[in-house]
């Protein structure tokens, strides 16, 4: 029997490139409702929206979602997640899945997969997903986070830079992917053991996390194991810009 899990969807109103992003309309529904709908199709026993904005809270209550108003000063989404887990009274061995509030096309199967992977790997405190990189442009794109794992599927590191750097191949040619190097793109969905979250918050950011702007590096910095599996379904891009929003609107028929 699969271990029960809770989904938390962090949703912030502030966005440099797309203010009010969670409330942007997509085919008659605010984006946050689209994400919530997808999460509810998963096997999660509970789906909760965590927001720092009264407008998002009101919208969620309007379409029937369970939502919490959190503090605004969190350093990262995981810090916000810890507040929610604490307020919900989740047990230390419970599993919580963090689904980003700007992923209206997230496949429910990936939510189930990441939760099941963490349940199946007791040596890890975090589980996440990845997929192959097929284009050299993605490898050199700092907005595409790369991940390298060990033989057991545990993360060695994450980076916005090409990872690994194929020294000899790139000395000859940077217009194509080197043969024999399994480059992988990290997919930003995480499952956590609730007991780990308090440690994560207490540690605070490390210099490596700050340099890359990747909060998962804080966990690796402290020796925490992160299990990384290949996603069973394709993860369509989320919404970061007005252009992304228009693309999703076309997909969903607006």
Swiss-Prot record:
It comes from the Bacteria. It comes from Pseudomonas aeruginosa (strain UCBPP-PA14). Its EC number is 2.7.7.38. InterPro entries: Cytidylyl_trans, KdsB, Nucleotide-diphossugar_trans. This is 3-deoxy-manno-octulosonate cytidylyltransferase. GO terms for biological process: CMP-keto-3-deoxy-D-manno-octulosonic acid biosynthetic process; lipopolysaccharide biosynthetic process. It is an enzyme of class 2 (transferase). It is found in: Cytoplasm. Pathway: Nucleotide-sugar biosynthesis; CMP-3-deoxy-D-manno-octulosonate biosynthesis; CMP-3-deoxy-D-manno-octulosonate from 3-deoxy-D-manno-octulosonate and CTP: step 1/1; Bacterial outer membrane biogenesis; lipopolysaccharide biosynthesis. Belongs to the KdsB family. One of its GO terms (cellular component) is cytosol.
